[in-house]
């Protein structure tokens, strides 16, 4: 709604494959979600295809929403960034499919973490409940309660062109230097 009010395009959203369950998977997909596996290891075809999809998103200048931590924090605490999708975005930028990539960090916080009870059970050793239709039905009671406020904060945008000023060109970096760059960009996004 906020995007609509400000004449901004709704982004496509990178979502975990665990959210592709009936019936919400279809709803999420129609709302712009695309689903990705948690790991690309030992699957070069999937990795290559996914990277091509990310390059297409960049080339078409479609806003892309992703969670730098790889998932929502159910504890409410900041988690370490995951750099897989970030690295694909930067590789697409470096290949020239787009002039610049601009990251807009968004903080979403809550007075109450709804998953607190299940998170505590997991910390005590219980297995994590798998997302699915049954968990959605059981969660219906959650919608009846008031949990306080939701806070949304947009941080200063981070332009990759600006970020790279004074740094060696991406194309001249070796694998270790690129990994350090991914770390630096990830830290700049979350700080």
PLM segments and residue spans:
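Membrane-interfacial terminal anchoring regions of lipid-handling membrane enzymes
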Residues: 1-191
């Amino acid at each position: 709604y906020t995007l609509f009010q400000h004449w901004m395009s709704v982004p496509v959203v990178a979502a975990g494959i665990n959210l592709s369950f009936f019936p919400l998977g279809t709803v999420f997909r129609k709302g712009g979600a695309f689903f990705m596996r948690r790991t690309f290891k030992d699957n070069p075809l999937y990795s290559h295809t996914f990277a091509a999809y990310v390059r297409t998103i960049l080339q078409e200048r479609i806003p892309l929403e992703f969670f730098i931590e790889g998932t929502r924090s159910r504890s409410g605490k900041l988690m370490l960034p995951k750099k897989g999708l970030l690295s694909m975005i930067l590789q697409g930028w470096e290949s020239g499919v787009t002039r610049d990539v601009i990251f807009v960090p968004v903080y979403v916080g809550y007075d109450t973490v709804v998953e607190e009870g299940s998170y505590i059970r997991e910390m005590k050793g219980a297995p994590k409940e798998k997302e699915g239709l049954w968990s959605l039905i059981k969660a219906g009671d959650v919608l009846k309660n008031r949990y306080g406020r939701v806070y949304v904060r947009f941080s200063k945008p981070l332009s990759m062109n600006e970020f790279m000023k004074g740094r060696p060109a991406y194309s001249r970096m070796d694998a270790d230097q690129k990994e350090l760059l991914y770390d630096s960009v990830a830290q700049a996004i979350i700080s």
